[in-house]
């Protein structure tokens, strides 16, 4: 029916968000996101090496902190770290249908 519904599942490590399209409880999954409480997953470089050729971007800021982004197909990985830590780590994964 074109209506989006969101389902949140909270875990010790973070939140899993499932987006569906269609009637409530009978829709098709269109998007899944996992947002971790802490950016302590794999490093940006490790995921980049694993994924291979992809759209990538990094920014380093002494004030706002550091950020990285990898997009391969319909999968997106986001990374972050504190301003003094140049080793950015995974904190979010998005999968799209």
Model-derived segments and spans:
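Acidic/histidine-rich, surface-exposed loop or edge segments in extracytoplasmic proteins
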Residues: 25-33
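A cross-family detector of function-defining hotspots
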Residues: 1-25, 38-97
């Amino acid at each position: 029916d074109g209506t989006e519904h969101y389902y949140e599942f909270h875990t010790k490590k973070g939140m899993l968000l499932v987006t569906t399209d269609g009637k409530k409880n009978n829709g098709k999954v269109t998007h899944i996101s996992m947002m971790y409480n802490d950016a302590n997953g794999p490093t940006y470089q490790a995921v980049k090496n694993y994924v291979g050729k992809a759209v990538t971007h990094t920014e380093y800021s002494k004030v706002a902190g550091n950020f990285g982004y990898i997009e391969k197909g319909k999968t997106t990985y986001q990374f972050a770290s504190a301003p003094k830590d140049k080793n950015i780590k995974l904190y979010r994964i998005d999968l799209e249908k």
